Amino acid sequence: MLDGLVTAMRTLTVLSVPGKDADEFSRSLYWFPLVGLLLGLLQAALAWIGMVSQIPEFSALLVLLSGVLLTRAIHADGLADLADGFFGGKTRESRLRIMKDPAVGSFGVIALILLFLFKWIALTRIVAHGQYEWIVSGIVLARFVQVVLASVMTYAREGEGTACRFVAGAGGWHVVVAALFSLLILVLVMKMQRLPIVVALLATAVSGSLTGMLAAKKIHGVTGDVLGASSEMTEALVWCSALLLLFY
């Protein structure tokens, strides 16, 4: 079972961990929310340290920079590829081909600029109000969305790509276990405050549903890029939803 944690750590982070990968990569999906918790705590700690400067904009920038470095920017890369493929291609085949191209196009650049702009604005307010729990919650829920999409959707490519090994064996139990982990973390981090929990879950549901429906329409399934993009968009939407409560 712990080999799944090793695979999850190696897939989602730059952290080097001992041990061997799981024979079935889908077993790592159970651990995605816990890896998200580790990333969230590290980034929230950096945000707290950054606030020693009394400059929330700088603290928010530390969160974004650490997120990129800790994850090798694989999820941001997925969002850029998704934007290029979904909005630059005319057919399913052309979209998949564009998404596989390592070059970043104009749609990808625009998507990344908007993503980091929205994240930075939201994080600036979050750290200014000392609401670090939102940083952790957004990162955990973003990994949970990846589990859901990998489990309920088919793989869009013909048996190729890194994500194929995760999607192939994914199913309902992966969602159930990941959901329990995510909900437990959310309740503890949010200190059982009902409204913030509901708002965060609604933002997650909206992000995951929209990404899934768009992927189903454009390429009839998911790829690693779709899973990465879903993570980035969920983080952004959860953090932006925090603003509703901060200014409520």
From Swiss-Prot:
<feature type="transmembrane region" description="Helical">
    <location>
        <begin position="60"/>
        <end position="80"/>
    </location>
</feature>
<keyword id="KW-0997">Cell inner membrane</keyword>
<feature type="transmembrane region" description="Helical">
    <location>
        <begin position="195"/>
        <end position="215"/>
    </location>
</feature>
<keyword id="KW-0169">Cobalamin biosynthesis</keyword>
<keyword id="KW-0460">Magnesium</keyword>
<keyword id="KW-1003">Cell membrane</keyword>
<dbReference type="InterPro" id="IPR003805">
    <property type="entry name" value="CobS"/>
</dbReference>
<dbReference type="GO" id="GO:0005886">
    <property type="term" value="C:plasma membrane"/>
</dbReference>
<keyword id="KW-1133">Transmembrane helix</keyword>
<keyword id="KW-0808">Transferase</keyword>
<comment type="function">
    <text>Joins adenosylcobinamide-GDP and alpha-ribazole to generate adenosylcobalamin (Ado-cobalamin). Also synthesizes adenosylcobalamin 5'-phosphate from adenosylcobinamide-GDP and alpha-ribazole 5'-phosphate.</text>
</comment>
<feature type="transmembrane region" description="Helical">
    <location>
        <begin position="134"/>
        <end position="154"/>
    </location>
</feature>
<comment type="pathway">
    <text>Cofactor biosynthesis; adenosylcobalamin biosynthesis; adenosylcobalamin from cob(II)yrinate a,c-diamide: step 7/7.</text>
</comment>
<feature type="transmembrane region" description="Helical">
    <location>
        <begin position="227"/>
        <end position="247"/>
    </location>
</feature>
<feature type="transmembrane region" description="Helical">
    <location>
        <begin position="103"/>
        <end position="123"/>
    </location>
</feature>
<dbReference type="GO" id="GO:0008818">
    <property type="term" value="F:cobalamin 5'-phosphate synthase activity"/>
</dbReference>
<feature type="transmembrane region" description="Helical">
    <location>
        <begin position="170"/>
        <end position="190"/>
    </location>
</feature>
<keyword id="KW-0472">Membrane</keyword>
<comment type="similarity">
    <text>Belongs to the CobS family.</text>
</comment>
<dbReference type="GO" id="GO:0051073">
    <property type="term" value="F:adenosylcobinamide-GDP ribazoletransferase activity"/>
</dbReference>
<protein>
    <recommendedName>
        <fullName>Adenosylcobinamide-GDP ribazoletransferase</fullName>
        <ecNumber>2.7.8.26</ecNumber>
    </recommendedName>
</protein>
<feature type="transmembrane region" description="Helical">
    <location>
        <begin position="32"/>
        <end position="52"/>
    </location>
</feature>
<dbReference type="Pfam" id="PF02654">
    <property type="entry name" value="CobS"/>
</dbReference>
<keyword id="KW-0812">Transmembrane</keyword>
<dbReference type="GO" id="GO:0009236">
    <property type="term" value="P:cobalamin biosynthetic process"/>
</dbReference>
